């Protein structure tokens, strides 16, 4: 499986806001709704679930409406749809999906409330995607730590939250840390290729926010 199949929803994040584009293309009421819809759709969210979700019912409570939006997304993102179907076929026939980085995911059918054995399409499409992101962030963490150590910075790495690295730094070092994280994410495609031996052809965009805690953050203009 090539990296192009993992590109999925990325058209070219350096050129325009994909969520605003989808908001307009699929006639959705806000950028936030378009963004949340996209990430749930990636994991095979059902039209019925959207029609019952309080975040989406103000838009429409119609299963047909949300199925139409889902179908439009699959029409736009044909390669991702094909990847989903490929994952489901692999998982249900072999029980294993192997990522481009070599990580293996094992699957097995489970009994539902009716006692039937079923395969979870949500898990099958979710795990490889989440794992791919985790493997990329592992490279980012190591690179950031090594660069901070070389520069003699005194800040402390606290945690990773999804695709965000959290560090506790002194005010006097703030500008140095901003520059460090900006450069790490700009270099991340080549660092991923170096770490895993797989050509990474997806542009990476990084954002840096600062503040006294995780709630009160202000994004820095890079």
Residues of each region from the PLM?
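Conserved catalytic core of nucleotide polymerization and phosphodiester-bond processing enzymes
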Residues: 1-222
């Amino acid at each position: 499986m090539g990296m192009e199949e993992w590109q999925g929803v990325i058209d070219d994040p350096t050129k325009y806001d994909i969520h605003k584009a989808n908001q307009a293309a699929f006639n959705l009421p806000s950028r936030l709704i378009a963004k949340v819809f996209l990430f749930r759709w990636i994991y095979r969210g059902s039209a019925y679930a959207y029609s019952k979700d309080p975040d989406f019912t103000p838009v429409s409570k119609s299963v047909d409406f949300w199925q139409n939006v889902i179908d439009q997304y699959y029409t736009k993102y044909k390669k991702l749809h094909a990847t989903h179907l490929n994952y489901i076929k692999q998982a249900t026939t072999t029980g294993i999906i192997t990522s481009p980085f070599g990580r293996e995911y094992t699957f097995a059918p489970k009994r539902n409330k009716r006692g039937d054995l079923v395969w979870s399409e949500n898990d099958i499409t979710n795990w490889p995607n989440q794992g791919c992101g985790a493997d990329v962030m592992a490279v980012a963490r190591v690179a950031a730590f090594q660069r901070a150590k070389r520069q003699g910075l005194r800040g402390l790495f606290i945690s990773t939250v999804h695709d965000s690295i959290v560090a506790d730094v002194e005010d006097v070092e703030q500008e140095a840390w901003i520059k460090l994280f900006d450069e790490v994410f700009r270099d991340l495609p080549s660092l991923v290729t170096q770490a895993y031996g797989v050509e990474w052809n997806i542009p990476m965009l990084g954002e840096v926010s600062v503040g006294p805690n995780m709630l009160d953050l202000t994004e820095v203009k890079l």
